[in-house]
Amino acid sequence: MSTVTGAAGIGLATLAADGSVLDTWFPAPELTESGTSATSRLAVSDVPVELAALIGRDDDRRTETIAVRTVIGSLDDVAADPYDAYLRLHLLSHRLVAPHGLNAGGLFGVLTNVVWTNHGPCAIDGFEAVRARLRRRGPVTVYGVDKFPRMVDYVVPTGVRIADADRVRLGAHLAPGTTVMHEGFVNYNAGTLGASMVEGRISAGVVVGDGSDVGGGASIMGTLSGGGTHVISIGKRCLLGANSGLGISLGDDCVVEAGLYVTAGTRVTMPDSNSVKARELSGSSNLLFRRNSVSGAVEVLARDGQGIALNEDLHAN
């Protein structure tokens, strides 16, 4: 019996003057059986008409757009090159693969730092001369200088709302019913598994369950910096209060009080007055984390029943 462990896609790649890959857009990636990883350049006649019309050089940007077919033999392997990396990011944002459903390690090492503009991606070297030429076309807006572009410039998932496109990176996984407000942020290989409200930061690797609310200014620790290796997940119907923070995983129906940052090493007072480190409660359900306003101690209490209920009108996307 065949096993779906690979992926493939026909895309358009932007090459800089030195041949480096600035980006690759895969409009219709697909999962495949395992095979041999490779990227091949396609002739104009080998791609759909709507893509063929976009192939060619842009002398103002000093770039060339080419058609490619990329095959990933196994999603368990690390990305082999920029084409491979972009295909993986598209698989996540197209919701073909959930966060941690593929190997996202090593992406930074194969991707190029790019100047992202309203006229398309540009190389950093010589950009001021490029900017001058582009100004003949109209205003030049630089969205950022980064290795990861905005998701919506490549993938617009159905059933979601994103108030600020700059706040969601390509490679984010947004389930139908998800709303990302202006101060929300979702990194790559991270996101939601169901209808969720995102007004805080979902760092790389973090997964948020159905019906949960990441409050305004709330922060969920990731693994990209600081030497952390623990991958944090939040279960269903959880609430991270405004300006709260989380460094452990939560099960279902949990609440973290507004303004409270619970790290793995935070000492937490139990209902029986014993004190434990929060990491010992990681993954538990039906808990309320709060700070005692008199003693200042962080307390955890048991909660009965299900957690929060989202406003359905805000998630009918």
Swiss-Prot record:
**Quaternary organization:** Homotrimer.
Q: Main subcellular localization, coarse class?
A: cytoplasm
Q: What class of enzyme is it?
A: transferase
**Organism the protein comes from:** Mycobacterium tuberculosis (strain ATCC 25618 / H37Rv)
Q: Where is the active site?
A: E199
Q: Per its Swiss-Prot or TrEMBL record, what regulates the activity?
A: Is activated by Mg(2+), Ca(2+) and Mn(2+), and inhibited by Zn(2+) and Co(2+). Is not inhibited by EDTA in vitro.
Instruction: Please tell me where Mg(2+) 1 binds in this chain.
Output: D166
Q: What does this protein do?
A: Catalyzes the conversion of the cyclic tetrahydrodipicolinate (THDP) into the acyclic N-succinyl-L-2-amino-6-oxopimelate using succinyl-CoA.
As for family, the record states:
Belongs to the type 2 tetrahydrodipicolinate N-succinyltransferase family.
- EC number(s) reported in the record: 2.3.1.117
Task: Enumerate the catalysed reactions.
Answer: (S)-2,3,4,5-tetrahydrodipicolinate + succinyl-CoA + H2O = (S)-2-succinylamino-6-oxoheptanedioate + CoA
Sorted UniProt keywords: Acyltransferase, Amino-acid biosynthesis, Cytoplasm, Diaminopimelate biosynthesis, Lysine biosynthesis, Magnesium, Metal-binding, Transferase
Biological process according to GO: diaminopimelate biosynthetic process; lysine biosynthetic process via diaminopimelate
Q: List the disulfide bonds.
A: none
Q: InterPro entries this protein is in?
A: DapD_actinobacteria, Hexapep, THDPS_M, THDPS_M_sf, Trimer_LpxA-like_sf, Type2_DapD
The protein here is known as 2,3,4,5-tetrahydropyridine-2,6-dicarboxylate N-succinyltransferase
An additional note in the Swiss-Prot or TrEMBL entry is: Was identified as a high-confidence drug target.
**Annotated residues for binding of succinyl-CoA:** R201, G216, S219, A242, E257, A258, G265, K277, R290, R291, N292, S293
- Where along this sequence does the record place binding of Mg(2+) 2? E183
